[in-house]
């Protein structure tokens, strides 16, 4: 997912001939680090866009730094705080400066219920597909997803598979637009990325085929469970939401002591939340928690009782 965002950002810069990349500070910190590494290697500047009280991109701050030197604006929805962005006004603002919008997501299952960033005007959609049937595995291998509008089909990295019908009426598949790739263009290729994630892709395809339209139900379950746990915890003394924006399956809370809370949960066999002060010093005392379809209601009640 992080690599997909970096590839899209650099592609936008190369296509536009501009040298600045604007990154929402609400993007996953590791994604931002990877984008900055790619940008440094290619001679581009990265500027961070602050978040507002909602946890979403601060629109006024973006207006203040967005101009015609910006190649792309990168955002994430749901973002690192679990907050859902309103992508359409961001796309309109970005396109007003003839810049490109790279819209990411933290959890692919959110696509089952949220409006497509493409329909909202994003030029690139990037993210992590691990949530589609691929187990957690100490950091990988995972499944990066990168999609674009038709205007960039001949420039995006990776392999493209085309479908057609042969003269006997049977559907056939073939690798297409290969003149973009390393084995033909060598050092002039769009990208030198060449890892093969076919196994992860196959697992995702089987998972999605099995779920079918129930992906929407799964996504709705994530929303319900996250908000149930959020409401249980914010009823406790000293616990309150850090942001006012709507959330998917993650949420950020202020709490009396994140370390003590995690220690108590760990002793009871639960994996605690993420201490936000590690990457966001201004959110010292903040904790990022998650509740997915895998978490039972009795577990959420137990967590709330443990933290009383």
Task: Pin down the residues of each PLM region.
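Conserved PLP-enzyme active-site core in the AAT-like
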Residues: 3-172, 238, 253-255, 259-265, ...
């Amino acid at each position: 997912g992080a690599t997909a965002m970096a590839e899209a950002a650099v592609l936008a810069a190369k296509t536009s001939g501009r040298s600045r990349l604007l990154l929402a500070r609400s993007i996953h910190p590791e994604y931002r680090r990877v984008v900055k590494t790619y940008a440094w290697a290619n001679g581009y500047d990265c500027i961070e866009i602050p978040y507002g009280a909602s946890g979403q991109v601060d629109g006024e701050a973006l207006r203040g730094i967005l101009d015609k030197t910006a190649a792309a604006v990168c955002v994430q929805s749901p973002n690192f705080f679990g907050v859902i962005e309103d992508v359409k006004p961001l796309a309109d603002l970005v396109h007003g400066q003839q810049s490109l919008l790279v819209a990411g997501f933290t959890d692919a299952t959110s696509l089952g219920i949220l409006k497509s960033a493409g329909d909202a005007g994003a030029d690139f959609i990037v993210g992590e597909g691990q949530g589609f049937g691929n187990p957690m595995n100490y950091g990988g291998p995972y499944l990066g997803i990168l999609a674009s509008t038709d205007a960039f089909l001949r420039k995006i990295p990776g392999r493209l598979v085309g479908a057609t019908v042969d003269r006997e009426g049977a559907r056939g598949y073939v690798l297409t637009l290969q003149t973009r790739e390393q084995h033909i263009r060598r050092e002039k290729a769009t990208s030198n990325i060449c890892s093969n994630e076919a196994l992860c892709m196959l697992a995702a395809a089987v998972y999605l085929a099995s779920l079918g339209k129930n992906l929407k139900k799964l996504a709705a379950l994530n929303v319900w469970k996250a908000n149930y746990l959020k409401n249980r915890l914010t009823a406790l003394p000293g616990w309150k939401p850090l942001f006012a924006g709507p959330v998917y399956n993650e949420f950020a809370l202020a709490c009396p002591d994140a370390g003590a809370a995690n220690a108590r949960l760990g002793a009871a066999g639960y994996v605690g939340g993420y201490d936000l002060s590690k990457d966001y010093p201004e959110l010292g005392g903040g904790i990022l928690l998650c509740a997915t379809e895998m978490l039972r209601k009795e577990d959420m009640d137990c967590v709330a009782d443990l933290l009383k």
